[in-house]
């Protein structure tokens, strides 16, 4: 059986049609995006929200379990769940009740609450690692992990794999374009490239060669 070639021109036309239809069906989101551009770059509170999905930006209003609804009344089954950070789903009752109770008592004291000890003890029991430290974002976690690795090893370089994402940290915002390391984002300090190395995932020979140099402080492994 012969297999014909994919008509890429037809695919481009189909994508163009579907993109236009998507925009047409989301007039309220379009209005909010335009309104947002008057006070936020790109019309969104965090710059990465403009390119996270390959469709026009939508604005959610509510979520329940695995589903959420946008301002135009469309309901979605969310297979991403905040990059898996929201693994309990949207608005789980035990979480919302606990948050409401604590908010009424006060929050953000800049002092350690008793619950932090309970959480650390629970994590230690479940995972088997004795000590835990909490951060406000994954980027902060990676930044602190890199610093700890550099202190404990006396080395500087961070080894990563192509296709990775480790947050908005100077030390991990580079990529290997074949002609050496290049910045993934503008404005990164030039010296940051000296502290990183990016290789292909599953290339064991390249990994062994990189580690043999004796200058790798840590390996961050999250190919995407």
Regions found by a protein language model. Give the residues of each.
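Active-site-adjacent loop/helix segments that line or gate small-molecule/cofactor pockets in enzymes
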Residues: 4, 11-62
């Amino acid at each position: 059986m012969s297999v014909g070639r994919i008509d890429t021109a037809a695919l481009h036309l189909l994508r163009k049609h579907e993109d236009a239809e998507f925009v047409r069906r989301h007039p309220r989101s379009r209005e909010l995006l335009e309104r947002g551009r008057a006070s936020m770059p790109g019309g969104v509170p965090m710059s990465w929200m403009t390119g996270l999905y390959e469709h026009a930006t939508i604005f959610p209003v509510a979520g329940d379990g695995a589903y959420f609804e946008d301002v135009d009344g469309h309901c979605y089954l969310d297979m991403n769940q905040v990059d898996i950070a929201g693994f309990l789903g949207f608005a789980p009752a035990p979480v919302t009740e606990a948050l409401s109770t604590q908010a009424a008592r006060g929050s953000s004291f800049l002092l350690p609450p008793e619950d932090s000890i309970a959480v650390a003890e629970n994590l230690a029991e479940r995972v088997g690692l004795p000590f835990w430290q909490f951060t406000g974002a994954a980027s902060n976690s990676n930044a602190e992990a890199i610093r700890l690795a550099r202190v404990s090893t006396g080395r500087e370089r961070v080894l990563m794999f192509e296709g990775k994402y480790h947050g908005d940290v100077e030390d991990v915002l580079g990529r290997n374009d074949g002609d050496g390391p290049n910045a993934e984002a503008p404005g990164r300090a030039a010296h940051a490239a000296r502290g990183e190395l990016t290789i292909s995932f599953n290339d064991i020979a390249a990994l062994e060669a990189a580690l043999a140099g004796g200058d790798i402080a840590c390996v961050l492994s999250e190919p995407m």
